[in-house]
Amino acid sequence: MNAHFRPGRGELAHLERVSVDRSFHEILRSLEAIGAAGAALAVIRERVPDHEPEPVVFDVAVRFLTALNEGAPVEEALLCLQIRALALLGFAPTLDRCVQCGKMPAPGRSASFDAARGGIVCRACGGGRLILSAGALRRWVAVQATAEFPEQPWPDGERQEIHDALAHLDAHHATVSVRERTSAASGRWEGRSS
C-alpha cells in the first residue's frame, strides 16, 4: 500500500491518496489466518515504539502475511513472527546459556526457562518455571536465524512449549499482553488480570 500525505497541524496529516500494491486476499478464506494476522499486528504494535520506523520488522510482517496467504501453518507462522520480532527488537530470550551464571546447557538436552529472568536457567541457579525440550530449543534458535516461514506443522509438543514460553515472556515484559490487545480489539477485554 502506498499512502500519500501532506502535513497538517501538529501530529495530524492529511491523507491525499492510497493505492494497493499487494493484497493478501487468500488470508480472508480462513478465520484462523485472519485471527493470526490480527494477533501479529498486536505483537508488532506492542513491541515497536510509536513514531519509530522499523523497516526490518515491517519486512518480517510482510513475509508473515505472504506465508499466511500461501497457506503456511497458521500457528507456526505466528510463533515465528513473534520470535523474530523479539529478536529484531532486542527482546529475544537467552537460550544458549544460563542467564544467571552463564553455564551452557548440555547439547541435545531440555532446559528450564524463566521468562521473568529472560531465558534459560540452570538447576544450580534455581531452574525455571517451564521446560523447553531440546527440539523446541533447536527450533526456536533456527527460527531466529532464518527469514523463512514453515511449510509444515511442527510437532505438537514443540509448538506448545514455544507458545507457552512466548506467552510467559509476553506476560512478564509487555505492558499490555498480546492476548489482552486481541481481546480489546474484539470488545472482550476487561483489563489486566495479573
PLM region spans:
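Non-catalytic alpha-helical scaffolds and adjoining flexible linkers that form interface surfaces
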Residues: 1-194
